[in-house]
Amino acid sequence: MQTPSLELKGSSFTLSVLHINSNDMAVIAAELDAKLAIAPQFFLGAPLVVNLSAIQATDFDILGLKEILTNRQLIIVGITSACPELTKQAKSIGLATVKTGKEATSQPQMPKTTKIVKQNVRSGQQIYAKNADLIIVGAVGNGAEVIADGSIHIYGTLRGKAMAGAGGDRHAVIMAQKIEAELVSIAGQYWLTENLQQNGAALSGCIRLEGESLTVESLPL
């Protein structure tokens, strides 16, 4: 029997959702550039769904938004929570309408494996633990990036960037023996160096997400 040349099957994927809260394209572009500068390689080529629930103006420039994203090598696959007029405009430029439902609000799949790196992560290096927790037995230097869909445990000093819950896991944590990070992020919520200093993160600590805000808890050395 001849194998069919194509098959249509249902599946699920983790997509980042970009919430738009302004009609001003210049403001959107500037804030997007600021976020991309934090971890450019992590966001490069990332597929996005744009949430327009906060936009009521029917003259919102969806085409302009699409150009802003594509010019920065981000891929907009569709929109969600838009008013009927904006939904119509989006369809006219080839964007899908993504409906929210039980499948969209369900918890991300919890990582089932652990990736262990038994060495220092140096400037310019990026370690990504896909669908896994990440353990670093060593330090993470300035300019280095460690990313995990699950939690990140660092048995050393964190000086670079650590991004846990990259697949949307809001229960992920970041733990390190000493935190001097350039950036920490859990499920898209992030702190920069100044935020860490303001919240007293310096020695051994555990960073987690509570609601929409990060918190840090000191751990015994």
Curated annotation (Swiss-Prot):
InterPro entries: CAP/MinC_C (IPR016098), MinC (IPR013033), MinC_C_sf (IPR036145), MinC_N (IPR007874), Septum_form_inhib_MinC_C (IPR005526)
Protein keywords: Cell cycle, Cell division, Septation
GO biological process: cell morphogenesis; division septum assembly; regulation of cell division; regulation of cell septum assembly
Pfam family, one: MinC_C
Keyword Translocase on entry: no
Gene3D superfamilies: 2.160.20.70, 3.30.70.260
Record-stated family: Belongs to the MinC family.
Subunit organization: Interacts with MinD and FtsZ.
Function according to Swiss-Prot or TrEMBL: Cell division inhibitor that blocks the formation of polar Z ring septums. Rapidly oscillates between the poles of the cell to destabilize FtsZ filaments that have formed before they mature into polar Z rings. Prevents FtsZ polymerization.
Name this polypeptide is given: Probable septum site-determining protein MinC
Organism: Shewanella halifaxensis (strain HAW-EB4)
